[in-house]
Amino acid sequence: MEAEGSSVPARAGSHEGSDSSGGAALKAPKHLWRHEQHHQYPLRQPQFRLLHPHHHLPPPPPPSPQPQLQPPPPPPLPPPPPPPGATRGRYASSGASRVRHRGYSDTERYLYCRAMDRTSYAVETGHRPGLKKSRMSWPSSFQGLRRFDVDNGTSAGRSPLDPMTSPGSGLILQANFVHSQRRESFLYRSDSDYDLSPKSMSRNSSIASDIHGDDLIVTPFAQVLASLRTVRNNFAALTNLQDRAPSKRSPMCNQPSINKATITEEAYQKLASETLEELDWCLDQLETLQTRHSVSEMASNKFKRMLNRELTHLSEMSRSGNQVSEYISNTFLDKQHEVEIPSPTQKEKEKKKRPMSQISGVKKLMHSSSLTNSCIPRFGVKTEQEDVLAKELEDVNKWGLHVFRIAELSGNRPLTVIMHTIFQERDLLKTFKIPVDTLITYLMTLEDHYHADVAYHNNIHAADVVQSTHVLLSTPALEAVFTDLEILAAIFASAIHDVDHPGVSNQFLINTNSELALMYNDSSVLENHHLAVGFKLLQEENCDIFQNLTKKQRQSLRKMAIDIVLATDMSKHMNLLADLKTMVETKKVTSSGVLLLDNYSDRIQVLQNMVHCADLSNPTKPLQLYRQWTDRIMEEFFRQGDRERERGMEISPMCDKHNASVEKSQVGFIDYIVHPLWETWADLVHPDAQDILDTLEDNREWYQSTIPQSPSPAPDDQEDGRQGQTEKFQFELTLEEDGESDTEKDSGSQVEEDTSCSDSKTLCTQDSESTEIPLDEQVEEEAVAEEESQPQTGVADDCCPDT
């Protein structure tokens, strides 16, 4: 495939990377973490590639030249399989073809050249008949009644499942061609044994996947669906059942019949053998699926295994890498911690004797007495710089609003100002008959329950998440998809999602046997508390902004807000990511290529991920804002570490101000958490989030460039390090997956640490072809020499003891 990719010139005008004068491809910018061969692959073969580790189905060859005035020749036979060890691949039709024709299968190689030309023309010119309207709007019959009933599904009118419904009846998954230039996340690595997986087989290898138009499928359930589709199509080809009317499940437009006589016996046996192999793989996957687990849990367990391997490798490189790995593992993998709970002090014992009959943290505030509809300021709060504030708020619909400037201009009322502006912008006050004085009273009361002395999880963060959610709701891909009630629920959930945050983590509250942890049984402690406070404040005087909603609307909004806020628990990150990626990829390989979002489960899943993306959006903002957020979160972490030190507790990862590697933590945070999430969101709304991904890449590059490069330690230091090795850290994951291999369970490896008093830091994160970012040539050579003399000995970050 590498030879194919490099020998065929790119079609002029077929891609942004091609110049306008001919087929010569421009080199990819240096900051893009991809090879350049994808510019040279012809657009006549759009396809999805599916990744699973054990077998390989050969790709379709390019179409043969057609003699003039003669019928097309028989379809070419599949090429021989790739060399051993290649990543298993499966092919399905492109997103562009799929959306245009509502579902070609992976036997697209049998289509006539004319059909391929139409596909290529549609991709290159953007001309797609039937999709002139917004790509994700409801059909015309919904425009007057486009309300989704949370309890009963879609409202009266044409059902999205109606075969006569236009392709715009839902969220249409677009072909992701531009995305192929960008480095993919670790999710696209092979799930085979990490140590036996060569670099060339990674997602970013020119051999494995550097083909223009590829889209790799990594979730197991979507892989099974695509493989079964391959089996179905191969069976049809082998048995001459191609003339059969296409089923609803597998529509085949203009697929020519294949005469068995035109296939040699050897090729026939080969195709039959590959079909049987494909079916065996599907059966193996389905046998591991337990009835009590969802199909997305297959993806969640797979992603956790892969992240565990990445973190284990990262932890072996240095103490700072080990600390970053611990932080990511403890925060985002929903691990169960065995901790020694310290004995409570006498003051704490007396405090715990108080009854738990009321929600803690709710204060009695009076904002309504001075507010009337006639005297409410323009932006809800009094400010002497109203005109300057108005200028800043002109960007409320744009990504990267300077929320710190708004906090300064509004007298530290950014949440009230931004929420009021968004409600006015979206006309929610009129739609739900919300009195403006009631809205301002509630918002000011809510904002007062965010702690001003908490560095990160305060009212500014809440305002930032609200505004980010507002922008994501406005993306062209989601135009007219969500109802006004769903929009209100998402914005309200964003506003309350961190109210009364104490500035410490859930695990800290659990470890200290806090009252909140007892009340919520150690399960999403803070998230449950935020919801309780947010809804409790609605009961305060003149604070019920939902007073004019019907009973059913209130129940639906409460249900959605609860589901959204609980999903902001970072320990649920992997499950949330797996759910979304499974949903997106499953629709890519099914017949429609259209995400209908015709049930509550799918719709709330998108909203949950939207707010989760907004909550993890700091690295996607302009660098100036991102750095301020980083300083704030590290300050909050260090304060928690100081409290843990005072109590004699083990200091949480990244919370020890004496040895935390801030720059490396941000690179790891982006590589293993933020990038995979935003990459999946960008697939969902493609191409609307491409600028966000570009900013994320630039910010990662900046933090990577600021990591001090480590010189190799002196021989004496090396000897001292070998004598002073500390306790080794090992990652362990408990997956709810029976039949997991021993290599998967024992994939965690130990790290050897050096206690030399060096301030150096070794950069080690995920790269496009390996999990290690190379240093400059001199340092890299020294590191290799050191590794030969003392295997697996890390470079210490400082002389302080490890946490």
Curated annotation (Swiss-Prot):
Enzyme Commission designation:
3.1.4.53
User: What does its activity-regulation comment describe?
Assistant: Activated by phosphatidic acid. Inhibited by rolipram.
Q: Where does AMP bind?
A: 457, 498, 615, 618, 666, 669
**Function statement:** Hydrolyzes the second messenger cAMP, which is a key regulator of many important physiological processes.
Q: List the disulfide bonds.
A: none
Residues passing through the membrane, by range: none
* Taxonomic source organism: Rattus norvegicus
Q: How is it modified after translation?
A: Isoform 1 and isoform 9 are rapidly activated by PKA through phosphorylation. Long isoforms that share a conserved PKA phosphorylation site in the N-terminus are also activated.
How many and how are cofactors bound here?
A: Binds 2 divalent metal cations per subunit. Site 1 may preferentially bind zinc ions. Binds 2 divalent metal cations per subunit. Site 2 has a preference for magnesium and/or manganese ions.
Q: What is this protein called?
A: 3',5'-cyclic-AMP phosphodiesterase 4D
Tissue specificity statement from the Swiss-Prot or TrEMBL entry = Expressed in epithelial cells. Isoform 33, isoform 4, isoform 5 and isoform 9 are expressed in brain. Isoform 33, isoform 5, isoform 8 and isoform 9 are expressed in heart (at protein level). Isoform 4 and isoform 6 are strongly expressed in cortex and cerebellum. Isoform 7 is strongly expressed in cortex and testis; weakly expressed in kidney, lung, spleen and cerebellum. Isoform 8 is strongly expressed in lung, heart and liver. Isoform 31, isoform 32, isoform 33, isoform 5 and isoform 9 are widely distributed.
Q: Can the keyword Cell membrane be found in this entry's annotation?
A: yes
Q: Where is the composition biased (Acidic residues)?
A: 774-789
Positions with a binding annotation for Zn(2+) 2: 498
Give the GO molecular function terms. 3',5'-cyclic-AMP phosphodiesterase activity; 3',5'-cyclic-GMP phosphodiesterase activity; 3',5'-cyclic-nucleotide phosphodiesterase activity; ATPase binding; beta-2 adrenergic receptor binding; calcium channel regulator activity; cAMP binding; cyclic-nucleotide phosphodiesterase activity
Q: Where found in the cell?
A: Apical cell membrane; Cytoplasm; Membrane; Cytoplasm, Cytoskeleton
Query: Where on the chain is Phosphoserine found, per UniProt?
Result: 137, 294, 296, 343, 370
The family classification in the record reads: Belongs to the cyclic nucleotide phosphodiesterase family. PDE4 subfamily.
